[in-house]
Amino acid sequence: MSPSAKAAGMVAFAQARKLNNRDRIMDAAATLFRERGYLPVSIEDVAASSGVSRMTFYRHFSNKAALAAALFTRTAAAALPRFLSIRENDYTSRTAVHDWLTTVFAVDQANRNLLRVFIQANVVEPGFSEIAHGFIADIIAGLGREIDAFAARQDVAVERHRWLRGWLLIYEILDQSNHAARGLDPSCDPMVIDILADRFSAFIAA
């Protein structure tokens, strides 16, 4: 092996190891946060659980808030296709919309412990809510590629009212699904999905 090839291999190995450490830290944090909640878990706990030093932790995350933000971003990226899946069905059909919302609520129910973590982080970490609101914007942008009702742009004055209506609709869906996952009444009432399906259908038909 030539010196240049050997050097390239070492660089690739170091990069892969760095990415692996980052994933290990995030995986360990997700497990600890689910088990104990966000506030009680320390950086030392996460480092120990992931098998890395504090120095290695700080190579990837400046603080616990940065870790929570990265974990939310990763979770949101994995969840986005589920929220956009309505595009692949007959979104003009109320039945299809209802089935889609039922799936959204069911998955949030399965991930309720992680949702609690993000709620706690949102309360104590400045800037976390902006990241969460960015996820709503991503959903709207994705839906807008196929569904005209969501194609309005927030930075165009004549379209902003329509965009805000779509933003509030998606926010309400996420909010009620979150509340239902934690067993909060009346969000866990099955009629909530019925009402949201009606509102979604009315929005895209208007």
Language-model-detected regions and their locations in the chain:
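Amphipathic alpha-helical packing segments from all-alpha helical-bundle domains
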Residues: 77-80, 107-110, 126-152, 163-167, ...
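Basic, helix-initiating cap at the start of DNA-binding domains
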Residues: 1-36, 40-52, 66-69, 91
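Short, hydrophobic secondary-structure boundary micro-motifs
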Residues: 115-118, 130-131, 159, 185
